[in-house]
Amino acid sequence: MERIVEREVSMKILSFGSLNIDYVYKVSHFVKKGETLSAEELNVYTGGKGLNQSIALSRAGMETYHAGAIGMDGLFLLDQLKEAGVNTDLVKILEDVRTGNAIIQNDEEGDNCIILFGGANQAISKEQVDEVFEHFKNEDYLLIQNEINELPYIVKKAKETGMKIILNPSPMNDKIKELPLNQINYFLLNEIEAMQILDMEEPKEIDGKYISGLLHQKFPEATIVLTLGSEGSVCISGDEYVEQSIYKVKTVDTTAAGYFIAGILNGKTIKEAMDTASKASAIAVSRQGAAPSIPYLEEVEEYKN
């Protein structure tokens, strides 16, 4: 049953991103070359950073539209988005391409290894992009990650439309550096992604304030949100610098990012938005599955550490 989510603001958010099917195998150890290994368990989840962030945004109270592509095997992903209140009218269904998917092995130590297949996520066309942006205006926001193709063209169309652009550069690779990063309004990233954008070698100790400061120097007009794992997160926006600790548990970037964006656009201060995001993340890590674990706004508001 589709849940009604109360909306607090009038602008729309376009999440143009990935839609995946995650096949998660529980194994005693990672399969080796030439080995046939029986899995102890198989779970199938909805996945993709794009899908997860769309759900987080919608559950945080934003009017959220997801654009992307799936194959005929991924129709159930639309049900998951709709149930969370996300508009799926801009998702293209392709008959000759399979939905993007991930084959994930989880071993007894809690580690994993992943094989990704881009599928329909890598079949975005310029024509589809043009059609999508006909539905948005200069008060709206675009959120992108790095799991679909045509990102440079998507950024170009967003700028022509006058939209603000939010970038979560994950997974990080050279495609991100090919984007006009000086046109990004919000960076949501972890310390490793930040160092790669800055062409830094990984230091022995991570200094979040130093790294976020370097990013701010490089992109002075942008708001920088840097997640630091167990150390929490930091944000620089203009002359404002804010640190946020975590609520006892490891941060979930997709959930935290969605709630931070929603908080800022709903008129919260940076400190308030970061605190809300940290609470949402703490709730999410206590549950199974990426998308199902994302809390609704009322749960976050009632959360006590």
Predicted regions and their residues:
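Conserved phosphate-binding/catalytic region of the ribokinase-like
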Residues: 3-7, 174, 205-305
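Substrate-binding N-lobe of the ribokinase-like
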Residues: 4, 13, 33-101, 303-304
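Positively charged, low-complexity intrinsically disordered leader regions
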Residues: 6-32
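Ribokinase/PfkB-type carbohydrate-kinase core domain
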Residues: 7-16, 79-93, 106-242
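Hydrophobic pocket-lining residues within nucleotide cofactor-binding pockets
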Residues: 19, 70-72, 249
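Short glycine/proline- and charge-enriched loop/turn segments
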Residues: 31-39, 190, 242-245
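Hydrophobic residues within alpha-helices
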Residues: 53, 77, 154, 260-261
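Short, conserved phosphate/pyrophosphate- and ester-handling motifs at nucleotide-, phospho-/glycolipid
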Residues: 57, 190, 258
